[in-house]
């Protein structure tokens, strides 16, 4: 999922994964066990998601001083049974239409998926009680829990799952994240336009509690993939049109319903028909904006219980006697990368891409970032992701090689090269440094501009610039979410339109491999192909921070940036 840079007073953050609760099921979902460190979700993206450099942050553990006194008590944020969270503004609350983390925060509370990911990155049952993968990985069978209901008490059945997933492939307006299940039979044909009938998708419901998914390959990954918000279940009344906010009237499948909505605050109410039981926190106030106020000041005043914060605030809060104990570092599976438009223009020539990549000192750019904000990337798959390929796949800085490659492509000293457009999402000094290095090392003048998030998404989808930047956060725990999903031929998230048969074969081998060592070897090969062909250049892995009210349990994160409200509970409640 795309993620934006977090700057300014409304910026957000994230925490470390605590031990998984003893119970493999409802204890994690609705009844927190023990008292893991409370924490917020990776909210820097919770403000809606794409664009330039990740501004999330993390403080190295040994720099954190021991608590000097207990953190601020919960004062005015709410009464018992209520939690107030800074969540940002969603661009969509429709599972089939959203494309950013900020929206996923809302979608995930209103609509439930078949599976979910716990703080230890384990796949847990949600609407599905169990699942089976065939020996060859080409069929996955999910068995739903009995007697599931939507928030209005109507039955939730397997046919609703089929209906919800088919909506991802609505002709003319497919989900931006539909490629996540590109290995399901019929999905690629629907995405390429070879088919316009969503009923050809390989998903069926032979009875009310069974969902059968036929795969081309990679069935072993499907239970993890469908934990992501796009695969949440919507009611039968949801047609092809986008689901819009309807306070008091929405039928949901998740832990909460939308009770009210204003320009500043959305209020969520616990769903008594939720499969894991009515959530312990009955009311959640989701703040869309602080209207210019500082999240630290608002938290200190008791106006919020969970808020993301900027890395600059995290640096001094670690030593603050009052707020320091409430500071949490959230796990963050995210990467910031720069990309090239490879379908047309000069960057369709691999030599031009290689020249530009070699003319920029990527490692120096990453090293100049504040370590509380990000760490240098070694490849597209972020640190902490299970199965991350080992090695350094970032292009080496070599000006002589860059000049030679550009000359071979027919542009000696940049002569004859058409105007290069570079649109960022607020990369600031890093973007400026890239423009300066290209001028100094290749003699190339780059036209640079920034755009707001919505306009930027539209531009990438309709008329991509020559160079662009994005941050991507994991949809599920798996390397393919950063390789095949972002760079596979025909993927809806492949912004630069790159296509490479050897890369596609490598990620297909990795996603279908039953042996972890074989999967690692295949994904390592895929990373090397990216490094050689340079459709994108990974720069940094983001880090995140939040403040969490003392006594709030169950707010641990899993690295995908979603705070599971159903698992929250006040100590002693």
Identify what each model region corresponds to.
Residues 3, 86-135, 166, 248-252:
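N-terminal lobe/hinge region of extracytoplasmic solute-binding protein
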Residues 34-38, 366, 444-461, 470, ...:
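Extracytoplasmic/peripheral linker and loop segments enriched in polar/acidic and small residues
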Residues 87-107, 127-128, 154, 176, ...:
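A structural "hinge/loop" feature
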Residues 143, 160, 169, 173-235:
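Surface-exposed binding/hinge segments that line
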Residues 348-436, 440, 525, 572:
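Append "and occasionally in soluble cytosolic enzymes with long acidic Gly/Pro-rich linkers
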Residues 407-474, 516:
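Ligand/substrate-recognition segments at binding pockets and active sites
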